[in-house]
Amino acid sequence: MCGRFVITSPPAALRQIFGYLEQPNFPPRHNIAPTQPIPVVMVENGVRHFRLMRWGLLPAWVKDPRKFTLLINARAETVLEKPAFKNAIKRRRCLIPADGYYEWQASEGRKRPHFIYRRDRQPIGLAGLAETWIGPNGEELDTVAIVTAPAGADLGVLHHRVPVTIDPGDFDRWLGCRAYDAETVMALLTAPEEGEFGWHEISTRVNRVANDDAQLVLPISAEEMAAEAPKLARKASPRQAAAVATEDDEQGSLF
């Protein structure tokens, strides 16, 4: 799945790779989480644009967003059928620029965070689906979900699903909703090739959303690992579940 990610490349470099019209300036982010505004690239009137959208898709047909569970991920296998995504896959495909993402590996009753990135350290374009929710008073909210697929043998050791990354050579195809129908782009929604991504274990400081600094992506040191071992060994206390759904939740036929 994908529940946190990183953007550290300079804005000018991202603009060159993703080819959007605007030149926004934004600081590096090392711990982007659901419900936060995230950069999104979409085609409007034949031109790529940079937009900010809330991470957590809210379908247009939702009447009361307070009673709806935000959808941060969308399963590639069911996007053509699920009511929450079937319109977006046809008309509102987008890219989310990133430099890597985090995944927690379950091991011996513990969850150890890892930073995952392209081995060539190039930015990645995460496949996204967007929706604009319009409220009863005409207010608009742009929202987005990240598409996931079954993991390959390599990344599968961390988690059974991975975010879909679109190759730059396929950006036009993925973003071109008018030129390419949904069935045509489904072949793009797969896990990356084995060996394309690398990863390393990091500090559990990443677990706290308020922590957002460059130290988060560094490999965990032996000293940090020794200090964190007692904390990881403790039985986690029950926490109130956030109103956010991933592809691992029992979303039923609605989603």
Regions found by a protein language model. Give the residues of each.
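Short linear sequence motif anchored by a di-proline
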Residues: M1-F255
